Amino acid sequence: MSESPAQEARTRTALVLYGSETGNAQEVAEELGALAERLHFVTHVAEMNSVKATLLTILPQEMLRSFTFTIFVVSTTGQGEIPANARSFWRSLLLKKLPPTFLSGVNYVSFGLGDSSYPKFNWAARKLHKRLLQLGANEIYPRGEANAQHPEGLEGTFIPWITDFRSHLLDKYPLPEGLHPIPDDEQLPPKWVLRLQEPATTGDELTEGTLSSEQTVSDEYPGLTRLDHDVRPIPDALTATLVENRRVTPRTHWQDVRQISLTVPDAVTYAPGDMICITPKNFDEDVQALIDMMGWGEMADKLVSLAPGEKLQAAGELHAPPIPGLEKYPKLTLRALLMDYIDIRAIPRRSFFSAIAHYTSNEMHKERLLEFTNPEYLDEFWDYTSRPRRSILEVLHEFHSVKIPWQHVTTVFPVFRGRQFSIASGGELKRTSGGGAKFELLIAIVKYQTVIKRIREGVCTRYLSVLRPGSTLKVQLQRGGLSSSVNQLVGPTVLIGPGTGVAPLRSMLWEKAAFVKAYREEHPDANPPIGPTILLYGGRNRAADFFFEEEWQELSDLIGLQVFTAFSRDQRHKIYVQDIIRRNFGLFFRLLHDMNGSVYICGSSGRMPQAVREALIEAFEHGGQADGPQLARRGAEEYLIGMEKSGRYKQETW
């Protein structure tokens, strides 16, 4: 007896594994998972570390080989590194005992997310791709690479790639006769749904810890949704207190830059180059606007919980909830969820338009929403979303017929991803008088106007800009890409940091100063064994954005810091940090070539790091003494590449 099309389709399976630092790779993985579902593959989407090393090394056939194919989606972090939620999986692939046939029979495709302003563009995806091939896996479709520097962002390369990939899957794995792809205008079952919390069970007393589903918590616990009081159970987070939020640029300056100081009571340790990750919150007026538009008023302040949808209830542990730790949130209401977790001011992806098209009965609105999901209308999609930076809240206001069920909030809307900020404090600035840890940040408040003449604000910096001293917020301490050894830190160093890019470099300088002070205390009659230190700082105007100017003289006395500045608007001809390098070829050749020094570059991605790289290559080419070593162009490029490989050339840009 032959199988029915539905029975035959159940043998089609797909696994989508992602490694994501900021959430972009996870969003791409979810979109690829939805694509596979629409082609009738039973699909699982999970972070790479969820495939435990024991499963991978002991039961490979039951895991990776059991799927028709596996899609690996990975972003590159730091200096070509694998994201934290994929590292244990990656390390398990590097075991020396694995034979070259270990992954034979595993069909895979990979997609990487990177930034071409970094020397190691998409390094993580390329490393993973190469290792999978070494272990015998079979690539079923050419890997894709997204570039954050694309004019349309990551989707500029992802959308054409996924469109062609869909056609390839239909050719390679044709659907059983009588079965057709699930069309975009047909809704997929939600993976996770919100539900009213169960009323208190009989015999239980109603205390502060248990409220029935008919009660609201807005009056009883007003602090839960306060912007300046953070109760979110974010995994691996510290509860920090904001002690300073000071504007360091003049009121007349075009940019609002803040020096923000946070403290925690414990003596947490961190190193120069490390980062603080802050998850933003929404403003009450924005949340109320969404509640009003959707008609969620009656539900807004009732207790809710997140539960797996019908398809996930028996799917096993691979499917992690979209918001880790949410079950520990005290008194979770729909309003609290929207305030603390849902990114309603994000620029929508194509998948958002596909999702909300199912929640309107207005045929004109539905047709237009689905047009935005069609690859043939990519330019219109970008003209409507990324180019004017139009937010989800604005889209829903314009497509006012869309009414999303509150139960589907986490399926339709993106969740907040933490924003990373380089720590600016180091050495003696890292500790409070009470022995706790202190984190100082230098943050530019994002606020600008787009082609549709509306003011745009960064979601996280808008949140930070209004926090007052005494506010609490949950922060995650993360390793950064500028980490260095002690020898590198105290050796010859060139630090290049225009604008707020100077933040992690300040941390390095104060760390070097702490080393010098400690050495002098132990060896009062000896000079500290430190190399020359040069800071290249760039800004618009010396009077407006020369951050930490008063500290550089103190550091000059302590560690011999030499500061070069490039203020682009203080004279008729613009000057940038790369111009300083070109004026001092001999100096940079001596420090970085003759003395084997290290260079650290931090600031905006795009033209600056590329221009600095080119200027350094020119310094290696032309900066040598007439009677000393000379490098041709090829040799200069190879020398800089060698610096990268040995960790003497590091870049952190955004």
From Swiss-Prot:
FAD binds at residues 389, 419-422, 458-461, 654. It is an enzyme of class 1 (oxidoreductase). Residues 235-485 form the FAD-binding FR-type domain. This is NADPH-dependent diflavin oxidoreductase 1. Pfam families: FAD_binding_1, Flavodoxin_1, NAD_binding_1. The gene is tah18. Its cofactor is FAD; FMN. It is found in: Cytoplasm; Mitochondrion. Residues 14-166 form the Flavodoxin-like domain. Belongs to the NADPH-dependent diflavin oxidoreductase NDOR1 family. Its main location: cytoplasm. GO terms for biological process: cellular response to oxidative stress; iron-sulfur cluster assembly; nitric oxide biosynthetic process; positive regulation of nitric oxide biosynthetic process. It comes from Aspergillus fumigatus (strain ATCC MYA-4609 / CBS 101355 / FGSC A1100 / Af293) (Neosartorya fumigata).
